[in-house]
């Protein structure tokens, strides 16, 4: 039965197949209803607000979007829908490297730097990992040739971490060496908690050899304060974010307030003792707290940078640049935009409302 916008959508409550043992549940529309549901929710913000009810906990909302990120049928529909592609172009620079460079040039003229992310997925063989390495080498070469800062972000599973640590290290080392040659930088994104130890080991080993590499730390993990202190002591640059993966309560704060409180505490620790920290958030209240702390502790505005996602909170981006803060945007590009898109909604469901607002303003 097709979904009727005049009536509430029917939903099924089912355990997430990947996290069943943690008793995490997802709310999912019937498969046949998804296209109509998306179109209607995008057209009617009031309906979406009703759909995202306040009594739905953050882990459930996160699991919902992560569930959608794995739905092949929805992905096929989204990637061929004119409306969905319109949304994607608002938050993804394009499918080609040249489109991403055009965005980077425009942002540079506005006083904003970027880190480019060539979107991809976990690889299943070493040939795919080598192809990902070669694609990123082309990105760094193109940034350098265009007179842009050479700065990229990447996920280790795209370079073979699940297959061979040594081969993953060799692949990423080529990128870090090239970035160092160009005076650039490679940021290693953090994935789910099972990857933290391997990711930190690889970053430490690369940093000891080349220096031009840093890592992401997620404030929703209990272990993150100890990791930040250790990275500060090793003079390794950290990007701080909240975290987007569905984690059990044994390793992560389940509540948003605790995640936010830990974020601010870690941001202050990075401002005090870190090496050019990158503070990634779209939360204006949190940004005000960071600004206040930096001012009261006489921390120069060029000693750290704010980071945001391309296409979100452009009003806040403009304000930060006008106030003399450094700002870098995370600019993704490539054909594999759908999983990225859904992970961003999982990370912060309020991004949905930024998307809706920007869609209807354009």
Tell where the protein language model's regions lie, with residue ranges.
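Low-complexity, intrinsically disordered or signal/transmembrane-proximal segments
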Residues: 7-11, 22, 38-40, 45-46
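Intrinsically disordered, low-complexity segments enriched in small/polar residues
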Residues: 8, 20, 36-38, 323, ...
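Low-complexity intrinsically disordered segments
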Residues: 9-10, 24, 31, 50
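Periodic, rod-like helical contexts
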Residues: 15, 21-22, 30-34, 38
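Generic detector of low-complexity/intrinsically disordered segments
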Residues: 27, 39, 43-44, 50, ...
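Positively charged, amphipathic and often flexible ligand-engagement surfaces
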Residues: 51-362
């Amino acid at each position: 039965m097709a979904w009727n916008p005049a009536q509430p959508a029917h939903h099924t409550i089912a355990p997430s197949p990947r996290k069943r043992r943690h008793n995490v549940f997802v709310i999912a529309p019937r498969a046949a209803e998804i296209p109509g549901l998306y179109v209607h929710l995008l057209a009617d913000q009031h309906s979406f607000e009703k759909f995202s009810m306040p009594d739905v906990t953050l882990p459930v909302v996160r699991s919902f979007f992560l569930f959608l990120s794995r739905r092949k049928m929805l992905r096929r529909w989204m990637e061929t829908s004119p409306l969905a592609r319109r949304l994607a172009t608002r938050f993804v620079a394009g499918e080609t490297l040249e489109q991403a460079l055009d965005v980077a040039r425009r942002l540079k003229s506005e006083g904003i730097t970027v880190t480019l992310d060539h979107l991809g997925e976990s690889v299943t063989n070493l040939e795919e990992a080598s192809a990902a390495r070669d694609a990123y080498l082309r990105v760094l070469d193109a940034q350098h040739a265009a007179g842009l800062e050479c700065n990229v972000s990447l996920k280790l599973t795209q370079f073979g971490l699940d297959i061979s640590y040594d081969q993953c290290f060799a692949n990423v080392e080529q990128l870090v060496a090239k970035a160092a040659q160009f005076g650039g930088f490679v940021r290693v994104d953090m994935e789910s908690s099972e990857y933290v130890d391997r990711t930190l080991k690889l970053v430490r080993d690369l940093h000891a050899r080349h220096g031009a590499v840093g890592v992401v730390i997620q404030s929703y993990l209990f272990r993150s304060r100890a990791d930040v202190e250790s990275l500060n002591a090793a003079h390794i640059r950290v990007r701080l974010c909240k975290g987007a993966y569905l984690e059990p309560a044994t390793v992560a704060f389940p509540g948003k307030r605790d995640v936010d409180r830990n974020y601010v505490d870690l941001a202050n620790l990075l401002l005090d003792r870190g090496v050019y920290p990158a503070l990634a958030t779209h939360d204006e209240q949190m940004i005000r707290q960071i600004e206040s702390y930096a001012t009261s502790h006489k921390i120069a505005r060029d000693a750290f940078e704010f980071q945001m996602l391309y296409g979100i909170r452009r009003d806040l981006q403009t304000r930060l640049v006008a106030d003399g803060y450094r700002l870098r945007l995370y600019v993704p590009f490539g054909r594999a935009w759908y999983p990225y898109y859904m992970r961003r909604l999982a990370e912060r469901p309020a991004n949905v409302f930024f998307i809706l607002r920007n869609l209807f303003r354009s």
